[in-house]
Amino acid sequence: MTRFRSLALLAACVAAPAFAQMQKGLPPPAATPSTASSRFAREAANGGMSEVELGRLAVERATNPAVKAFGQRMVDDHSKANVELQAIASQAGIALPGQVDAKEKQTYTRLAALSGAAFDRAYTDDMVKDHKADIALFEKASRASGDSAIKNFAADKLPTLREHLKMAEEAQASLGK
């Protein structure tokens, strides 16, 4: 019995390197995205989808031309960024949400109930606050993400987000007090 175990052990030791060599032709398993990268991608996707929905609402409801133009810019820029993020997330094995979360739905519902100057004011106030938070989120991801594609995406979008903040502040200022 001891001799049988010894032979079985020897056979396993000899076969293991041969089996390992056969496996070299297979692609390595996909790296699991870090929790921070996944969280960033999901938050960015949620925010991006919300920006598009709210931008469309602004195009329909805004009475101030600067607010209306800002809304259209949000639709254009965030639609493009959402497509880019989806491709990066898919490559990294990160599942993104298909719709905005409950908080963003509440924001939409609240703004959709407004019209005229009240809508313009509330929308621009939200966009200023939201873009400040977006910039902080993207700055953190551009420095600390463990996934280089996510890190580069965040860094590449920062100038656009800063421009959006400036535009939102200008639209807000055009409304007066």
Task: Label the model's feature ranges.
Residues 12-14:
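Repetitive helical segments and hydrophobic/amphipathic motifs
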